[in-house]
Regions:
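N-terminal amphipathic alpha-helix/helix-capping segment at the start of soluble metabolic enzymes
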Residues: 2-53, 105, 410-413
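Extended, intrinsically disordered, low-complexity segments
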Residues: 13-28, 39, 117, 355-413
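Active-site mouth loops of central-metabolism enzymes
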Residues: 44-61, 113-134, 167-176, 189-203
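Conserved mixed alpha/beta catalytic, RNA-binding, or beta-rich assembly cores of soluble enzyme
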Residues: 61-63, 75-81, 182, 186, ...
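Non-catalytic positions within long, well-ordered alpha-helices that form the structural scaffold/packing
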Residues: 70, 132, 140, 144, ...
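Glycine-rich loop at the start of a catalytic domain that most often binds anionic cofactors/ligands
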Residues: 89-97
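Glycine-rich, aromatic-flanked loop segments that form ligand/cofactor-binding clefts
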Residues: 97-124, 157
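Iron-sulfur cluster-binding cysteine motifs and their immediate structural context
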Residues: 136-166, 171-172, 182-199
Length: 413
């Protein structure tokens, strides 16, 4: 049995007292709201989801990210549809609750796809023996997940350290860390890197949905046709009834988007016993790049806001989201702006048109740079064993979650 986490530092508890007070104040504005707190957040427009990555399977990092963002107050943690990853998310949530017992546990969501063309479900692959030994390794430098590790080693019988041809490259892609962003594909000067796509097994997905530690599912679809979605939906069968929320992630495919969404919703209605959500996927896996990455998801929201025939459900931004997303939403007049809508499970109510924001690459980046500070000799470190780093990571997470939730500005920890 793992030892209990160290007592939380006083500053951590103080910061959470302020966070909880702010959250309580927000909940108080919806007196009489008997929906789960996650749904109440969607109605207000202050839902926040952490995206660990549909293909990111580094359990140690997922655990620490889940711990930190649970403490920061996210409503949902979205992860790969893999049993070990789901276990890591729940372990992180449990440790967060042991540090601050009053913390709200987020829903755990698994992500699957109906089509191998979805960019979130692929891994980079190459053979380092095919790489020239004098390669400058741009793939290693550009990877946001530190998923490529290459080292030049000497070839037996050759002893010149100064001559690159006397060595070879070893290593390659760290598969569990690669989440398919594709940035390495375009920078390889020798075109040696391939993207290997895959589709999650619906049978294994159905088994995960029957567990008591999975609350939601997100189905990624390309918007290129409903047949594959319908097939996946049929294969999941009654297992879909075990979750509280069903999300569909899709790109803006232009004028046909709303018709496609309505066709999907018609299929879903046969088993839709809980809540449903539409994830507006703007520019996938790009939030860590910079300010402009968030434009596409906000434009998608603006597009749908003018469509009176859009299907019922909550709406949430993703794909390129970062610290500039709220500013862009405000400029568009869509940040926590209410509308009269019918939502599955919540009928005829005033609620925010954009229920919230999902943060992926950017959220992982700002906390990940703290995780990387933990000395390497600790191996797969538990961040709670390093209180100073935990506080620093929490400060980073709060800087992202706080503006959506309306938390008071906290002093530097």
């Amino acid at each position: 049995m793992a030892p209990p986490p160290p007592p939380p530092p006083r500053l951590l508890l103080a910061s959470h007292a302020a966070v909880r007070a702010a959250a309580s104040a927000r909940r108080g504005r919806l007196a009489g709201d008997h929906h789960p707190p996650q749904v109440a957040a969607l109605r207000r427009g202050d839902w926040v989801k952490l995206i660990c990555g549909a293909s990111f399977e580094d359990a140690a990092d997922v655990r620490n990210l889940s711990l930190v963002y649970t403490l920061a107050g996210v409503d949902c943690i979205d992860c790969a549809a893999d049993a070990s990853v789901v276990g890591a998310v729940n372990e992180g949530i449990d440790v967060a609750a042991s540090i601050v017992p009053s913390v709200q546990s987020p829903w755990v969501m698994i992500s699957v796809n109906d089509d191998c063309r979805d960019l979130h479900f692929r891994k980079a692959e190459f053979d380092p023996e095919d790489c020239p030994p004098d390669c400058s390794k741009p793939c290693e430098k550009v990877c946001p997940a530190d998923a490529i590790s290459l080292e030049r080693v000497m070839i037996e019988g050759k002893h010149s350290q100064s001559d690159p041809s006397s060595g070879k490259l070893e290593g390659g892609v760290i598969t569990e860390r690669c989440y398919g962003c594709g940035r390495c594909l375009s920078v390889c000067p020798y075109d040696r890197i391939r993207a290997m796509s895959y589709v999650r097994d619906p049978t294994k997905t159905a088994e995960l949905l029957k567990r008591n530690d999975v609350d939601a599912i997100e189905i990624h679809t390309t918007g290129k046709g409903t047949d594959m979605f319908n097939t996946l939906w049929s294969n999941l069968d009654d297992s879909i009834n075990n979750v509280k929320l069903i999300a569909v992630s899709l790109p803006d495919v232009g004028d046909s988007t709303v018709n496609f969404m309505n066709a999907i919703y018609t299929t879903m209605q046969s088993h839709l016993q809980g809540y449903n959500l539409w994830q507006l996927d703007g520019r996938p896996m790009s939030g860590d790049i910079g300010r402009g990455a968030t434009r596409e998801t906000v434009s998608f929201a603006v597009h749908l806001s003018s469509m009176s025939n859009r299907p019922p459900g909550f709406y949430q931004l993703a794909g390129g989201t970062n610290s500039y997303t709220i500013e862009s939403l405000k400029k568009a007049g869509l940040f926590q702006s209410t509308t009269f809508a019918a939502t599955s499970g919540v009928t005829d109510c005033q609620q925010a048109f954009i229920g919230g924001i999902a943060y992926g690459g950017y959220a992982r980046k700002i906390v990940g740079r703290v995780l990387r500070k933990i000395p390497a000799q600790f191996g797969h470190a538990r961040i709670e064993d390093h209180p100073d780093y935990l506080l620093e990571a929490l400060q980073e997470a709060l800087s992202l979650v706080g503006p959506v939730k309306g938390y008071p500005t906290l002093p530097s920890l």
